[in-house]
Amino acid sequence: MSMQDPLADMLTRIRNAQMAEKSVVSMPSSTLKVAVAKVLKDEGYIAGYQISSETKPLLSIELKYFEGRPVIEEVKRVSRPGLRQYKSVEELPKVRGGLGVSIVSTNKGVMTDRAARAAGVGGEVLCTVF
């Protein structure tokens, strides 16, 4: 079976690993996954990430916990292959009143909703994280 939505697979692996209280989760790497991992690290949702290039590139994400609880409380895929969600800068959603972040793919790269608003660009809303 082929993987139809690699980003949804990444988010599901992170969610499952945190429920199992794993410290590191690995997955096949791609440019988009690395860009999303960079945003998650910059926002403090993960401790770090690393790309190992053996035969196939693997992305390893070091998960972050606070007082025994996962830092990522909720992660949801918004735009999916069957229903893409493109938003202008005015329509970019705020997650939980601004406490969480939306990760947006713009023509200036993958960034948070706050960074996209500051840059004055809209784009495809990939996922929300709280």
Curated annotation (Swiss-Prot):
Keywords: Ribonucleoprotein, Ribosomal protein, RNA-binding, rRNA-binding. GO terms for cellular component: ribonucleoprotein complex; ribosome. One of its GO terms (molecular function) is structural constituent of ribosome. Pfam families: Ribosomal_S8 (PF00410). It comes from the Bacteria. GO terms for biological process: translation. Part of the 30S ribosomal subunit. Contacts proteins S5 and S12. One of the primary rRNA binding proteins, it binds directly to 16S rRNA central domain where it helps coordinate assembly of the platform of the 30S subunit. HAMAP family: Ribosomal_uS8_B. This is Small ribosomal subunit protein uS8. It comes from Pseudomonas fluorescens (strain Pf0-1).
